[in-house]
């Protein structure tokens, strides 16, 4: 009788292990099988995702993702789980998530209805509004003041799309220039090649604070729209991983 009970317990243990293994799908299974989790980061999205003086990815969003990694090590029972950092841009971040190159994008990405057709998002971790920064000497205070001006924004962002729609809707005649990244856009403003830079207000504030002469700049009080949510971006349709990230954060 005792022998039968022991055998039954062993069978149940094996079955339980097998079921647990089968239950891992999508991103969790990929991470478990490869022993690597890949984090997408931005190199100049202060204070959320950027490179420090040692060229190490840091920031608030990166910290959130590293917390997820710690939880992954425990859940998957892989204490030696490796973390690979993969740089992304505004233009490349969605394709790299969608094609599986990156497991989590930890930058400064809006969770929008349009983007939900391609990717998914975890819990909101910050709210920010789309505004513009300009030099105080330009005396640009409202969106209407941008009429006829050269205005830069970053390629592949919701910000430049919103700027374009506002330009058309309000017939402002703005010349819109797309920069490769936030640093390039701010440099265009700093060197006079653009009159204003449209971006998330928190990112603009960080760029101004880190500039040579912060007092030279002014961020508009008027926003292009209501505040929108930042969230960690993950693959679409992977409810298991989404639930895990939400629980971990």
Task: Please identify what each model-predicted range represents.
Residues 2-11:
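Sec-dependent signal peptide recognition
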Residues 22, 63-71, 137, 144, ...:
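Extended ligand-binding regions for polar small-molecule ligands
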Residues 66-82, 159-178, 208-213:
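Ligand-binding cleft/hinge of the Venus flytrap
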Residues 66, 77-145, 218-223:
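Acidic, polar ligand-binding/catalytic clefts
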Residues 92, 106-117, 161-169, 187-226:
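A ligand-binding cleft/hinge motif common to bilobed small-molecule-binding domains
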């Amino acid at each position: 009788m005792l022998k039968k009970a022991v055998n039954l317990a062993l069978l149940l243990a094996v079955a339980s292990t097998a079921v647990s293994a089968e239950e891992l799908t999508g991103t969790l299974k990929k991470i478990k099988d490869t022993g690597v989790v890949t984090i997408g980061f931005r190199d100049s999205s202060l204070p959320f995702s950027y490179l420090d003086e040692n060229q190490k990815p840091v920031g608030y969003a990166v910290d959130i993702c590293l917390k997820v990694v710690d939880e992954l090590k425990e859940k998957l029972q892989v204490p030696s789980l490796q973390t690979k950092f993969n740089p992304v841009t505004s233009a490349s971040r969605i394709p790299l998530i969608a094609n599986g190159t990156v497991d989590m994008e930890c930058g400064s990405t809006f969770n929008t209805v349009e983007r939900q057709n391609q990717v998914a998002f975890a819990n909101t971790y910050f709210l920010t509004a789309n505004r513009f920064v300009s030099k105080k000497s330009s005396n640009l205070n409202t969106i209407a003041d941008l009429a006829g001006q050269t205005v830069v924004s970053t390629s592949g962002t919701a910000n430049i799309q919103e700027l374009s729609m506002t330009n058309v809707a309000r017939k402002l005649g703005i010349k819109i220039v797309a920069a490769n990244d936030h640093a390039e856009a701010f440099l265009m403003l700093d060197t006079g090649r653009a009159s204003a830079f449209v971006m998330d207000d928190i990112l603009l504030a960080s760029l101004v604070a880190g500039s040579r002469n912060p007092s030279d700049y002014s961020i508009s009080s008027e926003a292009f729209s209501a505040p929108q949510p930042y969230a960690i971006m993950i693959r679409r349709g992977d409810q298991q991983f989404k639930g895990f990230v939400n629980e971990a954060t």
